[in-house]
């Protein structure tokens, strides 16, 4: 049998190759660790920047306006007026009067919805006050229900109280507020601004629908508001 003997020179070469492989493996592991460390660092940094950005947005949104725009155009200013103009344009796009002029049923439903919303708003405000004072609201509900029935609103009577079938929030306010909130969400975080925009929406809607009451037996929203206020005042004046 032939015995194979490695020469010292071959042994040295083999040892050098093994050492080289170990060094490369060590370098590779070290590089992988470095890459992982850098990656983790950037993830942590991005997380911190994101937190700071969110915090900045929340702080910024509490102001009455904010700035945005490119360097070339300067800084455009978003104000309450911009939001209100958008709401007015949205109302124009809905085209209540245009639709009413083409569809008598739509015009009638619009008038009923508007007056029912006036009824609901006054009922809720007065009832909350009377309840807080411990006063029975049944007589008040009966009287304003009778007033709603007398102006021609459809509805039902239960426990001697007439309730308009369309009682509830003004159906045209929600589309205006929702559209503006979707486009300018930062302007609706502040509750005071939310209330301001809602009042404005109600105002422009009432202006828009006013002509629909010119040629009908129903009172205008303003006239119906006055009727309900006079009824409410009779009960409120006796509150302690």
Swiss-Prot record:
The segments labelled GEF catalytic domain in the record are 78-240
Subcellular location per the Swiss-Prot or TrEMBL entry = Secreted
Kindly state which keywords UniProt assigns to this record, in alphabetical order. Answer: GTPase activation, Guanine-nucleotide releasing factor, Secreted, Virulence
Q: Which gene encodes it?
A: sopE
Provide the function of this protein.
Activator for both CDC42 and RAC1 by directly engaging these Rho GTPases and acting as potent guanine nucleotide exchange factor (GEF). This activation results in actin cytoskeleton rearrangements and stimulates membrane ruffling, promoting bacterial entry into non-phagocytic cells.
Family statement drawn from the similarity comment of this UniProt entry? Belongs to the GEF (guanine exchange factor) SopE family.
GO CC term (a single one):
extracellular region
> What is the protein's given name?
Guanine nucleotide exchange factor SopE
Concerning NCBIfam families, the annotation shows: PRK15279.1, PRK15280.1
The question of whether tRNA processing is a record keyword is answered with no
GO molecular function (one):
guanyl-nucleotide exchange factor activity
Provide the GO biological process annotations. Answer: actin cytoskeleton organization
Query: Gene3D superfamilies this protein is in?
Result: SopE-like, GEF domain
* Primary site of residence: secreted
One Pfam entry for this protein is SecIII_SopE_N
- InterPro entries, sorted: SopE, SopE-like_GEF_dom_sf, SopE_GEF_dom, SopE_N_dom
